[in-house]
């Protein structure tokens, strides 16, 4: 609501142009999107400054672009929906670029998407078939692509990313809202979880409604196999003094990012609004970022580790009355033992944390 209030203030001053999704129930007369559209037109002298559309799926980007004297100078992108859930409940990321070049690119894509006619011709345009690469000294290495793509370009992008995941040398970390869609990228991620060649740690939102269609991969002593945990559908009985876990309306994990080799020679994170699903990448309005910068990658790595550690604990279906981290009378079962056993994932995790980044 607070963001909507500010947007409507800008609309009243004729300082806002907006593309708002109208897929499915987003265009219902009783929808919040419809209410916002009507309020926009009530306060603005330029009712055409709001355009509804969905390409051929969803208008799925989450972007703000700032302009001064008709020149873009700042842009916000990422996975965050500008809603109460998106800001206060979901796990999300947002990235702000102050590069004029990056901001202008997003502004040009916005103009090329503004209105249903432009959306219908976007797929196949230069914006949808080009990887926009920024390698200036003032920026980290960045590649940005804009969907919906023609099938050949979606395949090219997905092949490049899945090959990088399959070739991970030190680690793979991820937080993906839904990792079971048809996608060579998501297949590569799932395959890494099942192997022990690199440290793999990840979280998705929902495994299945009854946890039978797909399985979580929890910590297994004396094994280096990866972890994949779920954030929703958990039915834990928490140990005292904790009570019942509050239900969440919507997603807990809304991220869509994959980190490859955060301690390797060429760390990279793939992030943005794309769900990394092959079909939607050919239908939805989306943006996918590839960032080669150790500091940025480390920030995403910490987020993945934070989420997995918490929800792994939640996934264990705790039933005991007390939770003992350590038994001082029996150090053979001390909680930290596994962190020093060669061949154990915990030991691999400790070594990853303390190791120097490769150069």
Model-derived features: where do they sit?
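Aromatic-Pro/Gly-enriched surface loop or interdomain linker
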Residues: 89-93, 98-157
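N-terminal carbohydrate-binding/catalytic regions of secreted carbohydrate-active enzymes
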Residues: 1
């Amino acid at each position: 609501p607070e963001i909507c209030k500010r947007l409507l203030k800008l609309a009243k001053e004729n300082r806002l142009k907006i593309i708002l999704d109208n897929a499915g129930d987003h265009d219902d007369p009783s929808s919040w999107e419809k209410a916002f559209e009507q309020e926009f037109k009530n306060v603005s002298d330029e009712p055409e400054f709001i355009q509804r559309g969905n390409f051929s799926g969803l208008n799925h980007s989450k972007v703000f672009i700032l302009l001064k004297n008709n020149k873009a100078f700042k842009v916000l992108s990422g996975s965050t929906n500008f809603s109460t859930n998106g800001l206060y409940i979901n796990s999300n990321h947002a990235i702000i670029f102050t590069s004029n070049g990056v901001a202008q690119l997003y502004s040009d894509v916005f103009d090329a998407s503004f209105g249903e006619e432009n959306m219908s011709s976007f797929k196949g345009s230069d914006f949808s078939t080009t990887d926009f690469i920024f390698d200036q000294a003032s920026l980290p290495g960045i590649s940005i692509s804009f969907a919906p793509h023609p099938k050949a370009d979606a395949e090219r992008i997905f092949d490049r990313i899945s090959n990088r995941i399959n070739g991970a040398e030190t680690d793979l970390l991820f937080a993906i809202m839904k990792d079971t869609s048809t996608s060579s990228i998501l297949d590569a991620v799932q395959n890494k979880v099942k192997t022990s060649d690199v440290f793999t740690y990840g979280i998705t939102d929902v495994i299945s409604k009854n946890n039978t269609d797909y399985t979580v991969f929890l910590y297994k002593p004396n094994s280096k196999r990866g972890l994949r945990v779920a954030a929703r559908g958990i039915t834990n009985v928490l140990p005292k003094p904790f009570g019942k876990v509050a239900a969440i309306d919507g997603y807990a994990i809304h991220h869509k990012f994959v980190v490859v080799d955060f301690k390797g020679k060429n760390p990279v994170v793939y992030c943005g609004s794309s769900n990394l699903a092959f079909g939607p990448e050919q239908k939805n309005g989306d943006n996918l970022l590839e960032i080669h910068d150790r500091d940025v990658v480390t920030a995403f790595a910490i987020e993945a580790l934070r989420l997995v550690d918490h929800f792994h604990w939640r996934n264990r279906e705790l039933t005991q009355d007390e939770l003992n981290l350590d038994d001082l009378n029996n150090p053979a079962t001390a909680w930290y033992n596994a962190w020093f056993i060669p061949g154990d994932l915990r030991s691999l995790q400790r070594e990853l944390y303390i190791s120097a980044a490769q150069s």
